[in-house]
Each structure stands twice: as C-alpha cells, then as structure tokens.
C-alpha cells in the first residue's frame, strides 16, 4: 500500500546472510509509516525505533535536512 511506498529509513543495518535480514535503526518521534513493531520510550519528545526486519532497506529519508529546518 501507500504506507510502504512512503516509508523511508536513513540508517539501515543488514546481516551478511543470504537473504539478508535488515532493520531500520533510525530513532525519531515516530516510526516510519510501514512499521508494524514500533517501540517508543516515555521521554518528551518520544524516542521511537522500529523493530521490524525485512530482506531489504527502505529508501533514505534525508531527515537530517528536515530536522535542521524544524530547529531553526
């Protein structure tokens, strides 16, 4: 669906196995749109990370640019 198309990840780690097992390790106020297993802590703002694993990585978000715009 659209959630998978819009999902993105800046930092994706994969195992060397075939097929690889990949996980997005981005930390943010929410998980990407296609995440099924999102874990957040209770800080303010929350720090969330997706624990889904896939055989691929999502495209990069370039979230660092967006974060700079929000901070200024």
From Swiss-Prot:
The record ties this protein, via CDD domains, to:
BBI
The chain's disulfide connectivity reads 8-61, 9-24, 12-57, 14-22, 31-38, 35-50, 40-48
Similarity comment: family membership: Belongs to the Bowman-Birk serine protease inhibitor family.
Q: Tell me the function of this protein.
A: This inhibitor has two domains, each with separate antiprotease activity. 1 mole of inhibitor inhibits either 1 mole of trypsin or 2 moles of chymotrypsin, stoichiometrically.
Site (Reactive bond for trypsin) location in chain: 16-17
Source organism: Vicia sativa subsp. nigra
Q: What is this protein called?
A: Bowman-Birk type proteinase inhibitor
Q: What residues correspond to the site Reactive bond for chymotrypsin?
A: 42-43
């Amino acid at each position: 669906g659209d959630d998978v198309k819009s999902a993105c990840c800046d930092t994706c780690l994969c195992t060397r196995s075939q097929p690889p097992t990949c996980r997005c390790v981005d930390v943010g106020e929410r998980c990407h749109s296609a995440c099924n297993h999102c874990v957040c802590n209770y800080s303010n703002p929350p720090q969330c990370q997706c624990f889904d694993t896939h055989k691929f990585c999502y495209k990069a978000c370039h979230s660092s640019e967006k974060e700079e715009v929000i901070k200024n």
